[in-house]
């Protein structure tokens, strides 16, 4: 990417387990700061805090490690940090994000959200009881690194939950009013993979083929719904998970 001074954004587990420290060490000085205050449904306050780290540390690129929450937080922070704004200005009110953004490298550790290939960041504003997506062309990661081995340690309930999320993305992308033939093909392929492999991954976490195919399904489902967008199921989930 030709950038220096990276920021690692990851969930608290990665810092407690030592994995975040290992990633920073392996970067050989390219990653100079980290941010780990990311909750399962990232809050706008967390995005603003992450953006402030980017500003203060003169960050040139961002690495997001984890599930959809760190990736969504990093996407929004990497854009809003180049302004003096709070992300609240753009959250759920239809105000377009600025086009300028820092490069983002997404490294998913779950097979579920597909956030590594989408232009969407789903954020909560717990203080105001609101959860909504922000869509911006600047949210597309510059690179996505998909390593199925990173998903081996997912607990069975997380494997199941994220697997159903993949299926939901595929189905909603297919039945959305904005669907089109290419997205339909991707959606059907992703759904087929989920039906075939999610139970295997649930029952046997180290099943290499099942984990690889679920990562494939997650990425492809992300591509499938990016253009047509998700529908009623996700809309209903926002107040339930806020």
Region spans (language model):
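Carboxylate- and glycine-rich phosphate/diphosphate-binding segment that chelates Mg2+/Mn2+
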Residues: 120-228
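N-terminal small/polar loop signature for handling phosphorylated ligands or for N-terminal nucleophile
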Residues: 15-85, 200-211
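Glycine/threonine-rich beta-strand-loop-alpha-helix active-site module
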Residues: 45-146
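Conserved catalytic block of serine-dependent lipid acyl chemistry
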Residues: 230-237
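Catalytic phosphate/nucleotide-handling subdomain of diverse soluble enzymes
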Residues: 238-242
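N-terminal, positively charged, Ser/Thr/Ala/Gly-biased leader segments
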Residues: 1-7
């Amino acid at each position: 990417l030709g950038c220096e001074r990276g920021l690692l954004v990851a969930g608290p587990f990665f810092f407690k387990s030592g994995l975040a420290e290992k990633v920073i060490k392996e970067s050989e000085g390219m990653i100079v700061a980290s941010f780990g205050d990311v909750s399962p449904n990232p809050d706008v306050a967390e995005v603003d805090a992450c953006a402030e780290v980017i500003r203060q540390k003169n960050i040139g690129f961002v690495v997001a490690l984890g599930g959809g929450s760190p990736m969504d937080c990093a996407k929004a922070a990497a854009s809003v940090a180049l302004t003096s704004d709070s992300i609240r200005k753009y959250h759920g009110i239809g105000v377009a994000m600025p086009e300028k953004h820092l490069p983002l490298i997404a490294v998913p550790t779950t097979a579920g959200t597909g956030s590594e290939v989408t232009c969407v960041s789903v954020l909560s504003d717990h203080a105001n009881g609101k959860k909504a997506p922000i869509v911006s062309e600047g949210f597309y990661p510059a690179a996505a690194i998909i390593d199925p081995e990173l998903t081996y340690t997912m607990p069975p309930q997380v494997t199941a939950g994220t697997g159903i999320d993949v299926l939901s993305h595929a189905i909603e992308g297919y039945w959305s009013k904005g669907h089109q033939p290419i997205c339909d093909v991707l959606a059907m392929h992703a759904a087929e993979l989920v039906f075939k492999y999610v139970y295997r991954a649930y029952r046997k976490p180290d099943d290499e083929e099942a984990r690889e195919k679920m990562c494939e399904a997650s990425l492809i489902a992300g591509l499938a719904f990016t253009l047509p967008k998700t529908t009623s199921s996700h809309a209903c989930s926002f107040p339930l998970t806020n």
